[in-house]
Amino acid sequence: VSAEREAAEREWTAILQADLAEYDVARTRWVRARDVVLPNLRTRADLETASYGAGRAGIMEVLDAFTALANGRLDALDKEADVARRAVRFTLIYGQDQ
């Protein structure tokens, strides 16, 4: 019985560690999208808009930049939702105090 219990504890520990690693990866991806990618896309959209105003860029460059920004926002939201799903999963499986 003791050996079975130890095996079960090792299995749960391995599952918990894998879940924590997956959560960390998902959170890192979300934070990077939010703090690095989105600001860069905003800057690009602002620069393309200014270039268009100065006559150095066409409307397609501006539209492409704003399309990329919109897609970046959607991607960041998807990543945030993934982190939230994983957090809920932790709460349901391991409890709130863990």
Functional labels for PLM-detected ranges:
Residues 96-98:
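Short, solvent-exposed mixed-charge patches
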